[in-house]
Amino acid sequence: MTPHYSLHQGDAREVLQGLEDESVDLVLSDPPYLEEFIPLYGDLAREAGRVLKQDGFLIFYIGHYHLETVMKMVADVPALSYYWLVSQWNMSGMAKIMARRQICGFKPILIYRKGKALPNGWPLDILTMGGRSKNFHAWEQDVKESRYLVQHYSRPGDTVLDPFLGSGTTGVASLQAGREFVGVELDPETFAIAKTRIERTLWQSHADRTVQTPLEEWIAPECNKLLHPLGGCNNL
């Protein structure tokens, strides 16, 4: 059965108001990190707390600089509780945070849950990132990485929501993994790119095929030798 999807061009704060309570299983998104956009994280958390089903997950990327501020925002949403922090380890280049005189080698991915949700299997909290593609958008994330998160924090047939769709990576990953998808993007040109990518994904994929990402693809090399059968690594 072909997964269904729904795409919306507009302001996520307005579009999400039209979603029913407890209608989504996973919210996975990469909002902008610049200071002027940080209040959007609070809006995202409040809406996620409303639209997520019991035992659903909220997962989002965030820069180090505003990590504390954003975590305080999400802590004010009673429906959500902190679950875990995943490290997106950048193997191809490390950024200098000039205001803090700090070299940054990984990006935080924050995971919150509603209820007592647990992931599928034993997902790792270190994801390796080589040179990621920028073919569609300057802030584009890797499809394999998004698919890994989708596969572990939702189940086939679940509904995944991305309120900051960008070029559509989360949508592509969700449909490849056999999930329903809802995406929202403000910029008309970027929305058109996302729409084309997602439509092409459905055209290229078999209707009943779920693409599985091998666990080993996302184990940091130093962690690979130390991997416990149930997940986790030591002495990193």
Where are these regions (language model features)?
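S-adenosyl-L-methionine
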Residues: 1-16, 195-232
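Core catalytic lobe of class I
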Residues: 1-192, 235
